[in-house]
């Protein structure tokens, strides 16, 4: 069992040999210069798109599972409200330590447009943040970004503004799939950044057990990377998965030169969503999900932006308590 082998390693070596664990868990004060042990992560809200069996009393929302997913690894969350102005985005961005694009439902393109025009109610705002992240990193600041499912697809749309970037796939109702990892995965930051042995154990779980929950009608074909050099220049494909019809799609990515990661699957659902029988909740499924959360939050600790407490308090997600809806999501945070 991977956990037992990890304990053996921990007994024969010091936890100081795993700096991401040692430095982030002992206390609230940084034990390394430049390490931020109070990260604040912005989550881009989604426009109010009605789902089957529930409607949202608000202009946008976040599924609460994403909030708890980040909080469990030691971060706090600030909503980046999709209906707010670019000036508000510019205010929040230098105060946050990382950004997450969630899964859900939203349009990438302006309806009926003959050429690809980013939808003003979602994709244009997301790609604005994407460009800010790239610019910050280009200027020498470490600024991480993560995209899940819809957010994963958005990462591709932002890198390659073409209709054909996102394809149709047979991924509903939700299902689980194993990963076929590429050679890039074995040397990727995401599977070596916490500890090499731990990352290898998680890769083994993901490639042999159905721990990755998928719920999608769209995705990115591996052939799209061959069709559009913008994508292959920006991202390394870490894994390939297959939909219900056997069609391959990209499962995980890591940017080549930026701290940007994405998954077509939903690691947060294993921990916090219980309304679909297909969601895996067994031990190793939880191990995988907690690994992903801990990895991303560990990366946000490398960003040293400071959100002054008097400004942070009214922005924190706690100001919008979760609402139990017992539908597609267990709970949501809604914003008026």
What do the PLM-derived regions correspond to, one by one?
Residues 2-251, 256-257, 267-336:
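N-terminal beta1-alpha1 cap of cysteine-dependent amidohydrolase-like domains
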Residues 259-263:
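Catalytic His-Asp charge-relay segment
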